[in-house]
Amino acid sequence: MIEQKAVEYSREDEVMKRNMTRRNFVKLAGMAVAFAALPGCATLAADTAVKKPDGKQKVAGTGGERYVPYQERQGAESVVYFTRDLSAAGLLQIYDRVKKDLGGKVAIKLHTGEPQGPNIIPRPWVKELLQKRLPAGTIIETNTYYGGGRDTTEKHRQTLQVNGWTAFTTVDITDAEGTAMLPVPNGKWFTEMSVGKNMLAYDSLLTLTHFKGHAMGGFGGSNKNLGIGCADGKIGKKMIHAGDSGSQWGVNNEEFMERMTESTQAVVSHFKDKIAFINVMRNMSVDCDCAGTSAQPVVTPDIGIVASLDILAADQACVDCVYALPEESRHDLVERMESRHSMRQLTYMKKMGMGNDRYQLIDIDNGDKVITAAEAVKGVKGTWVPDGN
């Protein structure tokens, strides 16, 4: 068990957290990545934070800045479903393809957003999903590591009300009453991860993700939704973002991707086959929904929704769709992905045995035809789907 004193906030951490607004989080995350890119600085945090108990140094993988084309990948293929229908009806239709193992007490992990966040999944879509498919389902969340509208349970509940979630459902802030440790099978950085205690009360998990960019992860898909989103606000998220570096945001690039992925592995391993993944490619700012109203304007066109029982295949399919867009449409989001070395999310998930980076993309709009990512985005233009709330 990780000693509490090794992961608790110090008094200085608490002061820093109070001063860390979501806007500053986005700015400082970018500065941390830029600093790491300077000659001689890329492994500064790792040099002070990656010693194993036996004294050997742990080393993060490389190559996270490089996108691997489909033809260069090897291994089995998973199934990924795809629809262009960005609506409540489209969400229901694609959910039906992956719902078979979701039973008992079902949790729905999604990003409920900072106050007035413009890009989060529309509440009317989620309301219809709950009412028509998951009437006993519960949205789960955790408090944030950075200061803002969700870093305490009290503020988080206020933000849930502001953003319209409490008008039709309740949200379980799973770390409001404490934390629990989950094992990380075959982890390099962790043997355990700290998560919200209440998550363990659920039998199955639907991962409902707004796919978009991310200040530190490059992109935020199902991996980020679980890896950061299920880690509790005070212990788990600090384990990922800071490690033993002594800095609130001391971990970045490939090491950050690996730590986040190991956190996800803890959650996925806990639920075993009672888990499914849906990624909504809509309003894809280069910034995460953590940025709230300060997120960069959306310039990447909306694409559609993917769903799979394979977390890696789901995230890989979204990345492939972005890369299949015309250069002028994908430029900003691709730059964010590559500058943060985000492809290490994908290659590390594969290394950890979490899924396949090859898949059959099933077009449920056209008789379940198997298509390529290029065919999925053919004709996509700069569209904006309104929230409808």
Can you name each region flagged by the protein language model?
Residues 4:
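Cationic, low-complexity basic patches in intrinsically disordered or flexible, solvent-exposed regions
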Residues 9-13, 17-389:
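N-terminal and secondary-structure boundary signal
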